[in-house]
Swiss-Prot record:
This is Major core protein OPG129. The 73-kDa precursor is cleaved to a mature protein of 60 kDa during virion maturation. Proteolytic cleavage of major core proteins OPG129, OPG136, and OPG098, which occurs at a late stage of core formation, is required for production of infectious mature virions (MV). It comes from the Viruses. The gene is OPG129. Its main location: virion. It comes from Monkeypox virus.
């Protein structure tokens, strides 16, 4: 383990403006095939499009509207672009007021770098601050540096990289092949503009009035229908059962299909797609989808998956937790190959990484040591979708447990074996593991050095906890009967984290299901039986356990939890006299509640937990932790910056 004390490590870390993104693993477009809505055994994209046609998202009495493309002066734009041409995508978006000035500042910095022929290979945050001083650009909010750096990077990369290895969205914007236009015309017929517009409008309107699942407590929650087999995955519930800053903007307000359409037809995108565009343009690595061999088809399939997840979000917030076979998103997410990770992912990490990669969501920027030749290293800024915590590689004791709190949150390292950012507190020995180079950027005075924090976050911060003891074996417990062993090492999880003067609260957690999670949460069972989610709502912790409808023990535990929650409401949170009430006045309520659960219908209050129960389950069984700012504070902070 190497240790270097440097309070300015974040400011002097390489910002990585020269992107290593390359798409040369795939061809540009399939010259022999146009994707249609006809089902095909040989094309997974056509099958996805056929499901969109069959879906009746929302009915409304609106006429189908045709999008009129912007006319150009000649047809030269439809000709293929030579591979040695340069493509500029600067100024492609009209933005919200709060981001207009940020983008203009980013463009000014990028122009300064280009005009002065600045060497961007060693560009650091300190260099950017120096340029900002020269240009009289004042940014007092530390988190704005994350977004400002993204603006500079996207402008430089896509203005100076040749067409053959640049981003697919740039190729669509530049109309690099006539076949792109032919494919988008066919898509325009498949995505009925009226129905798709209604789906977008409905989910955006729903988002305006949604905070968490307690906002839907006046609805009945339906877990299963007799003709359905699939259910909303707990990871989807953790991400969208509560409104998370930045992710909500990219997934609900942004839309991949309209982004592609606007880039091709108008060469500009509308304000609601701006954050999605910036996320996509600053990707470090492309994704590859099994069975899809070209870039344009990959973008189409990405748009299909985004639409399927949007429908799942709408259903989640309406209390519909089941889905038909054709609507299941999980099989599509499992087919995505993440080229930036060099090891086999577990099922839950695969689903989490795939959901975030659809919109290029990487909310955490960390200064980490990247290995170079020999034993040397280079400090670089690394954007990460989530931070990996591996209890099996950490040496812990009862006096020194793994702690995720405001003090240890600054301890990050880069795992060269997997290409991921890992949580590596120096006091528990993770730095001795092969492939991990650990740098102590703050020395001993962590709390007093927050201004030099090596971590900045855009809205949300996610942790993935590797608890599977045999993770290198292929998963699929639901299909093969294979049972993973789970490491239940307790983790000291703080409900709140203070980072750069901003409070991030624990909003949701996905846990491994080992027992019934009510009577035997302290069970010695170590075999994985599934997953469940705990959301921290305005009314308290709430559990989403879709597998409880299939297990007699879990059904009984759920009924008992619902009855106790009802009694606490009547008795001012007291447990005394519960069984007397159950045999007396509560017998009618118990019978009606049992009938509801037999029909797989529940109310929000039925699955409320105490804070002690929730934190106990999360400590031993969590696999995903999601911290976030309060959404209203996140949005208002951006409007307040306009005043200055």
């Amino acid at each position: 383990m190497e240790a270097v004390v440097n309070s300015d490590v974040f400011l002097t870390s390489n910002a990585g403006l020269k992107s290593s993104y390359t798409n040369q693993t795939l061809s540009l477009v399939d010259e022999d095939h146009i994707h249609t809505s006809d089902k095909s055994l040989s094309c997974s994209v056509c099958n996805s499009l056929s499901q969109i046609v069959d879906d009746d998202f929302i009915s409304a009495g609106a006429r189908n509207q045709r999008t009129k493309p912007k006319r150009t002066g000649n047809d030269q734009s439809q000709q293929p672009i030579k591979k040695d041409c340069m493509v500029s995508i600067d100024e492609v978006a009209s933005t919200h007021d709060w981001s207009t000035r940020l983008r203009n500042d980013g463009n000014a910095i990028a122009k300064y770098l280009t005009t002065n022929k600045y060497d961007t290979s060693n560009f650091t945050i300190q260099d950017m601050l120096n340029i900002m001083n020269k240009l009289n650009i004042v940014r007092t909010n530390r988190n704005e540096l994350f977004q400002l750096l993204s603006h500079v990077k996207s402008t430089l990369n896509n203005a100076s990289v040749s067409v053959k290895c640049t981003h697919p969205l740039v190729l669509i914007h530049s109309r690099a092949s006539p076949r792109i236009g032919d494919q988008l015309k066919e898509l325009d017929k498949i995505y009925s503009p009226s129905n798709h517009h209604i789906l977008l409008s409905t989910t955006r309107f729903q988002s305006m009035h949604f905070t968490d699942m307690s906002s839907s407590q006046d609805l009945s929650f339906i877990y299963r229908k007799p003709e359905t087999n699939y259910y909303i995955h707990p990871i989807l519930m953790a991400l969208f059962g509560i409104k998370l800053p930045a992710l909500e903007n990219a997934y609900v307000h942004g839309d991949t299909y309209s982004l592609i359409q606007q880039l091709y037809e108008f060469r500009r995108v509308k304000s609601y797609n701006y954050m999605l565009l910036v996320n996509r343009l600053t990707e470090d690595n492309p994704i590859v989808i099994t069975g899809v061999s070209d870039l344009i088809s990959t973008e189409i399939q990405r748009a299909n998956i985004h639409t399927m997840i949007r429908k799942a979000i709408m259903n989640i917030r309406m209390g519909i937790f089941y889905c038909n076979d054709d609507d299941a998103v999980d099989p599509h997410l499992m087919k995505i190959i993440h080229t930036g990770c060099s090891q086999v992912m577990t099922d839950e990490e695969q689903i989490l990484a795939s959901i975030l990669s659809i919109v290029g969501f990487r909310p955490t920027l960390v200064s980490v040591a990247r290995p170079m030749n020999g034993i040397s290293y280079d400090m670089k800024l690394q954007a990460a979708p989530y931070i990996v915590v591996n209890p099996m590689k950490m040496i812990t004791t009862s006096d020194s447990p793994i702690s995720i709190n405001s003090k240890d949150i600054y301890s990050m390292a880069f795992d060269g074996n997997s290409g991921r950012v890992v949580f590596a507190p120096p006091n528990i020995g993770y730095g001795r593991c092969s492939g991990v180079t650990h740098i102590d950027p703050l020395g001993t005075n962590v709390m007093g050095s927050a201004v030099h924090s090596p971590v900045i976050v855009n809205g949300a911060m996610m942790f993935y906890v590797e608890r599977r003891q045999n993770k290198n074996m292929f998963g699929g417990e639901c299909y093969t009967g294979f049972r993973s062993l789970i490491d239940d090492t307790p983790i000291d999880v703080s409900p709140e984290i203070m980072l750069n003067g901003i409070m991030y609260r624990l909003k949701s957690a996905v846990c491994y299901k080992l027992g019934d999670q009510f009577f035997d949460c302290g069970s010695s069972d170590i075999f994985l039986k599934g997953h469940y989610t705990i959301l921290f709502t305005e009314n308290g912790p709430w559990m989403y356990d879709p597998l409880s409808v299939f297990n007699p023990g879990a059904r009984n535990a759920r009924l008992m939890r619902a009855l106790k929650n009802q009694y606490k409401k009547l008795s001012m949170d007291s447990d005394d006299g519960f069984y007397e009430w159950l045999n007396g006045d509560g017998s009618v309520f118990a019978a009606s509640k049992q009938q509801m659960l037999m029909n797989h219908v529940a109310n929000f209050d039925d699955d409320l937990l105490t804070m002690e129960e929730a934190m106990s389950m999360i400590s031993r069984h969590c696999c995903i932790l999601i911290y976030a700012q309060d959404y209203d504070q996140y949005i208002s902070a951006r409007h307040i910056t306009e005043l200055f």
